[in-house]
Amino acid sequence: MSAIIDSFIAPPCHDEIEILWQDEHLVLINKPSGLLSLSGKNPQNRDSVHYRLVQTFPGCTLVHRLDFGTSGLMVIARNKAINAALCHQFSQRAVRKVYSALLCGHVEHDEGVIDAPIAKDPALFPLMSICAITGKPARSRYQVMDRFYDAALPLTRVRLTPETGRTHQLRIHCQQLGYPILGCDLYGGLALPGTEQIPRLMLHASELNFVHPVSAEAINARHAAPF
């Protein structure tokens, strides 16, 4: 099998990372859209959340990632012990994440569940695919918050709650539902007339709930979507 070659070069991101809260153990940030979570192998993809934060917080590590185009809440561990404890919470699905998104079209039902297994396919890289045979279980909940009745580009604002954490899960699940996320270049969010000039992926990590590994305090972080 031939090696997968990632030719993506991230354009410069001039937006700053917003530090929302910190203590000696962890940092909560608001990641801007258009910034990698981790630096890529290509030297031109050096700029990232981790690259920037390690300058201020030496030894910090990423517990989880957000896609390049996704903005919003991330928790950063400031040492290996905190990283291990938070990773355990993620692996046990003890961390609750909620996203805000704008979807193309008017979603028919006010709420629902998308249960569709997701598979990697080297032939489709970087796209993922829905596949009942080789896919891993993937489940997302959605709730309609508002519908916008613009005749040229009808949209729906939704809350998305992933119950699993597959690559591109929310993006491909919304496409599977029939309403791609506005601005999504991989899964149909730039295909409709009027979407060509959308400046970003309209997906934002707006809620992050976990237990502080040291104090055992429930952390319920919130950050409103900028769209």
Functional labels for PLM-detected ranges:
Residues 88-89, 117, 173, 184:
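Residue-level signal for well-ordered alpha-helical positions
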Residues 96-109:
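Central beta-strand plus flanking loop segment that forms part of the substrate or channel wall
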Residues 59-86, 120-177, 203-227:
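The conserved catalytic core of RNA pseudouridine synthases
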Residues 19, 103, 141-144, 181:
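Conserved hydrophobic positions within beta-strands
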